[in-house]
Amino acid sequence: MECKRARAYSSSANLGSGFDILSMAHTAFFDTVEICVETKNSENIVIESNSKIPLEPNRNSATYPLVRIMEERGIKASLRVKVIKGIPEGLGLGSSGASATAAVMAFSSLFNLNLSKEDLVRYAMYGEIASSGSPHPDNVAASVFGGVVSVVSVNPVKVVEIPLNYSFNILLFVPLNIHIEEKTKKAREMVPKTVKLSDYINNSRYISSLLIGFVKGERDLIRLGLNDEIVEKARLPLFPYYPKIKEIAIKYDAVGSCVSGAGPSILVLTDKMTDENKIAEEGTKTCNEFNVECEVIKAKIAGGVEVERRN
């Protein structure tokens, strides 16, 4: 029985005002997906996992992309798919996107499809449909490419890797006792359909500030760019502790802070000028004030999805 296994890292989408556009892959967590071909003359997908994920192929973020690839490319096979979840689910860390990305990469390797990175993103987006009903591309793009990415087009898929000329580390405040059913779907429903022109202009300025800050290595521009007037504000009921954590992060000279994806996790960028211990200590106290138990995770920028070698 031939098998392939791939690993994809967690990610933080939006990065302030870059809703459905920007995302960052990091080493905080990763998912692994192993796909084995049992027979090539029938069509069946059996799912195994260490987590309570849907076992129906069309409802599973790892296997629904495979269903679509097989339909589109006329591939017939009976598959056993093992999804090893390392990324906490429903916490704004790209869990479904990483599973989808790892699955598509393993499948591409198994069937020698040699899919381009953009095709990996395009197929992995089906995993987001299975998870939340929306094919948002930002998390899967980060998990595919690694680093910081901008999704500049979805039809066709076009992703640009953002050059990083400023060295920073990552702190994540990850709530352990928050669980919201269909969180991503609900969070997307909270995003306003219309916005004030002044908010739109400010958000456009933030995006340009962040990207220029990354490219030119300018700390102040990165800090300014990690702000948002629209989406974070609309979703604040999901993470009421966020404004104070951000205030603490800036107080102790973090590069900047924002909500990780749809939350409730919070992303803080740090460097040699930052007092990480104070941010972790006071940020954890803030979580507790809101009856939220937060784990603080230290991470770095991650690379893209990879096929794991078998010993």
Curated annotation (Swiss-Prot):
Keywords from the named record: Amino-acid biosynthesis, ATP-binding, Cytoplasm, Kinase, Nucleotide-binding, Threonine biosynthesis, Transferase
Enzyme class per UniProt: transferase
Molecular function GO terms recorded: ATP binding; homoserine kinase activity
Pfam families: GHMP_kinases_C, GHMP_kinases_N
Reactions catalysed, as given in the entry: L-homoserine + ATP = O-phospho-L-homoserine + ADP + H(+)
Primary localisation category: cytoplasm
EC number, UniProt record: 2.7.1.39
Compartment(s) of residence: Cytoplasm
Function of the molecule: Catalyzes the ATP-dependent phosphorylation of L-homoserine to L-homoserine phosphate.
PANTHER family for the chain: HOMOSERINE KINASE (PTHR20861:SF1), HOMOSERINE/4-DIPHOSPHOCYTIDYL-2-C-METHYL-D-ERYTHRITOL KINASE (PTHR20861)
Listed NCBIfam families: PRK01212.1-4, thrB
Family: Belongs to the GHMP kinase family. Homoserine kinase subfamily.
UniProt name for this protein: Homoserine kinase
Naturally occurring in which organism (per UniProt): Saccharolobus islandicus (strain Y.G.57.14 / Yellowstone #1) (Sulfolobus islandicus)
Source organism phylogeny: Archaea, Thermoproteota, Thermoprotei, Sulfolobales, Sulfolobaceae
Gene designation: thrB
